[in-house]
């Protein structure tokens, strides 16, 4: 047998469009007049610059702003969390193996904060307030400010305390004598 006998000629051998691999979805008509699309080519400078000047350009800008405002899930969740005025600080109790969190934004004054702390550690402690001349309480409330200094709760005005407090510590009265 000669090699020509093994070669078959298909009836539509001139048109290989049916077997051509493309990136189009199956059943999508392809336009042969467009030719193969080239991806990955660099654009020329004039193709990147929008030369629409004047009012038509402003209208396109305004319409694009409207569509951005209608996006689902906008603004991002992280941005929305920043706008919420929450000021959580950790409260450590000397001798306890656990910490608690307190939202300072819920309270308007030191009295409310001390009441909440006593209720939080109910039956365990009594907190001495700075205004008391005799330190009758078992614990003294201290806090660490932005600079890392340990200060007594009640030494500064309430709003300044809320802004500067990083964490709170309920110290035994004997340990807080030098503060």
From Swiss-Prot:
What is an annotated GO biological process for this record, any one? auxin-activated signaling pathway
Q: Motif EAR-like (transcriptional repression): which residue numbers? A: 21-25
The induction text for this entry reads: By auxin.
Keyword Cell membrane recorded: no
Q: Which domain of life is it from?
A: Eukaryota
Query: What domain notes does the record hold?
Result: The N-terminal half of the protein contains two conserved domains I and II. Domain I includes a slightly degenerated ERF-associated amphiphilic repression (EAR) motif which seems to be involved in the activity of transcriptional repression. Domain II is required for the correct degradation of the protein through the SCF-mediated ubiquitin-proteasome pathway. Interactions between Aux/IAA proteins and auxin response factors (ARFs) occur through their C-terminal dimerization domains III and IV.
Function, as annotated: Aux/IAA proteins are short-lived transcriptional factors that function as repressors of early auxin response genes at low auxin concentrations. Repression is thought to result from the interaction with auxin response factors (ARFs), proteins that bind to the auxin-responsive promoter element (AuxRE). Formation of heterodimers with ARF proteins may alter their ability to modulate early auxin response genes expression.
Indicate the family of this protein: Belongs to the Aux/IAA family.
Kindly provide the name given to this protein in its UniProt entry.
Auxin-responsive protein IAA15
């Amino acid at each position: 047998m000669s090699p020509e006998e093994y070669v078959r000629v298909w009836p539509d051998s001139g048109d290989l469009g049916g077997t051509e691999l493309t990136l189009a979805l199956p059943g999508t008509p392809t336009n042969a007049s467009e030719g193969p699309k080239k991806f990955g080519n660099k654009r020329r400078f004039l193709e990147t610059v929008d030369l629409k000047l004047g009012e038509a350009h402003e209208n396109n800008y305004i319409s694009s702003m409207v569509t951005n405002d209608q996006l689902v899930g906008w603004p991002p969740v992280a941005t929305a969390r920043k706008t919420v005025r929450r000021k959580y600080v950790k409260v450590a109790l000397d001798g306890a193996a656990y910490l608690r969190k307190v939202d300072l934004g819920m309270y308007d004054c030191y009295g409310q904060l001390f009441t909440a702390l006593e209720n939080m550690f109910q039956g365990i402690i009594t907190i001495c307030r700075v205004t008391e001349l005799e330190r009758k309480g078992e614990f003294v409330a201290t806090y660490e400010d932005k600079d890392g200094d340990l200060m007594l709760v009640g030494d500064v005005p309430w709003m300044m305390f809320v802004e500067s407090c990083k964490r709170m510590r309920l110290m035994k009265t004997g340990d807080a004598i030098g503060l």
